[in-house]
């Protein structure tokens, strides 16, 4: 678990909640409690202790430069201990955030220099049978339509992740 004050920039996808619910029904330990379905644009982001107004302005500006998008989630991805659903339509915004803050290594470098845009469904699925069960349950829910409407900067507090601010995609009105 990361330390309090860790931040992330994400796109929350409320319509994808059933994917996490399916994994939770198989094993609640596989789903991070209190973390909604989302695509991480940059994690970890600038630590809260050194986060500046300029960083926040840059997040808002970059979010405004991308339109809101209707998404079709179709493909389950599995790696050892990990089940996700790919979201290739959001790769350009993920890449833009990585480019804007090129000194930050996504996921601390654990998944390479350019991790694919995805919704994490289950983490810690080290038992291959459990991972297969999650993959099958999630696969039955796809395809799933959702909409990316805003970017959110979140901060880890002692009691879990909390939003710091939300910036609409496509400008002030989210168009």
Task: Report the location of each language-model feature.
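Short, exposed beta-strand-loop hairpins at the edges of beta-sheets
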Residues: 153-157
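Basic, often amphipathic N-terminal segments
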Residues: 1-70, 87-149, 161-175
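A short, structured active-site edge motif that brings together acidic residues
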Residues: 73-77
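Short strand-connecting beta-turns/loops that link adjacent beta-strands
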Residues: 78, 158-159
